[in-house]
Amino acid sequence: MSNFWPQVAAATASLLLFPKVVQRIQLSRAKHRSLAGHSLMSKNLARWIPPLNYSARECFGLDGAPQSVVSQRQAGFKSLAHRLASESPRTREATQHVSLALSDLNFVSRYRFPIPFAQELSQQLRVGAVWKESGDNQLVDLDGRRFWDVTGSFGVNVLGLDAYKPLMRASCEEALSVGPLLGGYTGDIESVLDGLRRHSGMDEVSFHMSGTEAVMQAVRLARYHTRRKKIVRFSGAYHGWWDDVQPGVGNPMPPGHVFTLEEMSERALQVIRSRRDIACVLVNPLQAMHVNQNAPSDSALLAGERRLSFDRDAYTRWLQSLRQACTEAGVALILDEVFMGFRLGKRGAQGYFGVRADMVCYGKTIAGGWPVGVVCGGEHWMKRYNPLRPADICFARGTFNAHPAVIAGIKHFLLAIDTPEVTQLYRDADVTWQQALDAWNQRFESENIPIRVAGLQTIWSIEFLVPSRYHWLNLEALLGQASADTAKAARQ
């Protein structure tokens, strides 16, 4: 009998712990088998990676190329650096001066080259980041050199640089009549709300200062209404830089209430259905191009093994299954369209993939060139108070939310996309851009250039078909080509 009660206690403890053990195993199996799916592991590993700096002699011969090829690379890079420095002295000087005081530029400049090459090559080749003007989808630096804009200002530019100038001008002129009116609303608010509700299919709207803030508010509302803490995001997806949705490398805080799961996985759906602590699931439709991987970046050029694969039907089925799982579990499905909003169509990813979210977050694209964040959602999810408990509220404020210039910018953007011309562009976008990508790929193949392009409408990326350690040098070569194009245009 002396062992009876200890055995009972042990058995009881085992029974109580068993569901948690099963739950933990289930969660572990639902994570993507990569560092992107294991935030804490990647964060800890990053702290142990030692510095590696190649010398000038090593930088161009790491692939065992003959000395003649290495010499050509060295000479080409040196020539490019000299040409860019001599052709853009004012731009280079201004950029260097600004980087001493601007922490953002200092950080970006440090990681413009792959880390092992950065210390040596960044001193030789310094590019400009200060611009004089833009026009016709080109950027002009302080020295008059022109560059094609293929980045779209981090996703803001949907309509083209020149299309935004009249929108910004009109919104500024209208905002001047009321000045910095904050706390109230301008007369544009009615048409803006009508337009946002129509395009999103939602009941209510809230305004914020950035896409990151919009996602923060949507998550806060989901937690408020579900009384749960956990967030589900998918491997590789970006939802802004605040702690709860950007775990891992770059965030000094340990991963807290976020699960990073494998997208397009039945195991992820099982986790969502079975747990009772998940408040919301965040989906970035951009991931349809590269499921469970980070968006293509300079670091991807090191290996050149990146391949894009977009299957509209498969991703549609995934979103519909995810929608059903969230509904069954009482979990909010949040579409993060801060980048993708109004690229795939007037109803965004909801219309393109045929799925209805509980809340949609917009930013970047929607304000006609002005900074903004917007949350659109159903009445239940957007309510910030409990009518039966007056002190039970969900707080959200922002001094510059619904700024007159921003609201006017949204109005003019919505008017622009509702024109017959833009409506037709949306209707033909899939065919138009696929034809363009096919034409480029045919040209590359006919000229034996080992690259191809792939994408989703206006969002596209380059794939390298032959492995190389030096694909990233092509970015620098493009700067040299821009320089040559400017000189050629000046001679004509």
Q: For each of these PLM feature ranges, what is it?
A:
Residues 4-6, 10-492:
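Conserved N-terminal phosphate-binding loop of PLP-dependent enzymes in the Aspartate aminotransferase
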